[in-house]
Amino acid sequence: MYIVVTRSFPPEVGGMQNLMWGLTCSLAKYNLVKVFADFHENYKEHDQKVSFSIDRVAGIKLLRKYRKSYLVNEFIKKNKNVNCVIADHWKSLELIKTTKKKICLIHSKEINHKKGSFANRRILKAFNNIDQVVANSEYTKNLAVEIGIDENKIIVINPGVFPPKEIDKSSIKEAENLLKNKNPRLITVSRFDKRKNHEKVIMALRNLKQIYPNIIYTCIGYGEEEENVKKLTNELELNEQVIFLKNVPQGLKNALVSKSNLFVMPSIIHKTSVEGFGIAYVEAAQYGIPSIGGKDGGASDAIKNNETGIICDGNNLEEIYSSIDLILKNNSYLEM
């Protein structure tokens, strides 16, 4: 039996949630699986449909961690057939007291603390009691080694995605109506977060508009930087060139990606926040859409530079602009 301890799980929406869902479903095809996940408002309807057992843990964040660890420890004591505990965050394993094998996924942001700091010492103490570390990219592995995690414990497994589902005709039609008479078409699907770098794309769009008067940029997502990005769009008089969407059904999201020419997310490092991999690039590639990613972080594991897209310096506005222009002018990218 495998125990999965996670802070990110459906029905909550997001890249980490999709990753942990995919991992758990794949494990459950061949093994018994028990999940300990955070409470979510609509969890009952979701959890009734799955083939494995899920315990939901509610309460404020700090107490939730202790309660979840207690439940996991008690479950292991009562179930001798547990082989392994897998977690999506080192904090989820920090209080697990067992000799069973422990595996921790790492993504970069959560371990990116200065060597010797209190947070770093706490991280290293936790990883001393973890048997296997799975990094989502070479970048994340190198970061882990740099901060002091034992390299011999680390393997790199790039996150996977489920095969794309056929997009229903109504979603295709809705996407085509939203993008009608607009070309070329850029898209970003992500949280509005500083490291995602929406602002630089908007700035590049101002110049691209001079060459491509019918250009459109679709932004799907939500987050703390949303209002700042909208304000910049308004200041640069690009309201006709940018569409903001949130709470978009999966079918429409996939349709909008498939009907776009280019996925754009030239991520940067912001404080300790960094893009460890970028599953969204892979999801775009499933529909034959090239991507532009940033050189800072693990995007180069998801994008084959000058083949499936371009890796550029996300801090350099001219590089972002020229990378977008190059792909839009080069049919070999658009005919992937």
Descriptions of predicted regions:
Residues 6-13, 19-64:
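N-terminal strand-loop element at the rim of the active site
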Residues 86-92:
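Short His-centered aromatic/hydrophobic patch
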Residues 114-117, 145, 161-177:
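Acidic anion/phosphate-binding donor-loop and adjacent secondary structure
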Residues 134, 178-196, 202-205:
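Conserved donor-binding/catalytic core segment of Leloir-type glycosyltransferases
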Residues 139, 160:
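Carbohydrate-associated surface elements
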Residues 220, 230-251:
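Nucleotide-activated donor-binding/catalytic signature segment of Leloir-type glycosyltransferases, i.e.
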Residues 258-273, 289:
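Acidic donor-binding loop of glycosyltransferase active sites
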Residues 304-306, 310-318, 325-332:
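Conserved acidic donor-binding segment of nucleotide-sugar-dependent glycosyltransferases
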